[in-house]
Amino acid sequence: MSKKCNIVSNVLSTLNHKIDKVFNERYKRNILNDDSYFTRIGKKTSFRDTMKTVISFGSDSLPLEMSRYFNDKDILPITKSGFIQSRSKIKPGAFIQVMDLINKAYPCKKNYKGYRLLAVDGSDLSIAKDKKDEGSRKFNGENTKSSYMLHINCEYDILNDRYIDCVVQKYNQQDENAALVAMSDRYKGDKAIFIADRYYAAYNNMAHLKEHGHKYLIRSKDINGATSILKNYFKGKEGEFDEDVSII
């Protein structure tokens, strides 16, 4: 138990250090909408607290999440509207940069025959209603209220249970193929095998992965499908093309 507590304490200490590093290097990292934000003496909520509160969010209301982070349900150092204002000062890229620094501080050690196994997939995330944000609005039918969503594309190290990269897109502007290309272009780690579902089976994706020296395993649509790329691979051939593979 003591060992686990020490590990958690060390990780939290590292997180604090990396968040502070990102803030101290804000002029070159481009993480704030204005570099003067969070510099006023006596400010109720620091850059670190704002970042850590957002990182710790679950699915509860904002007041409850704030209470949980500050460990006091009756007295908070900042109001709900004040926190929203503080959060809006930080660019999304700040969280990606903190994630990158944490991943570098704790290198992934597990691999499969020398390769990291990186799964790429996307998922929708519900967000608060904002009538001005047409890019995130999901139309649910004539007699149904619209919902507001973001599309989250993630790169996940399967063997090390670690998120490596992320691309956030507005619901109506989502492009999973572009997200895969962006994440594969940014990846600078050890040799890897990128694993993706059939919606990623596109020549452009494969070309980008190959250009960067990555291996890939991408599920494809059935050969008889109208948009299946397998038609070009097995054109003129007959019979079955299945091949037995070992499962990790």
Regions found by a protein language model. Give the residues of each.
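Conserved, well-structured functional cores that handle cations and Mg-NTP chemistry
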Residues: 1-248
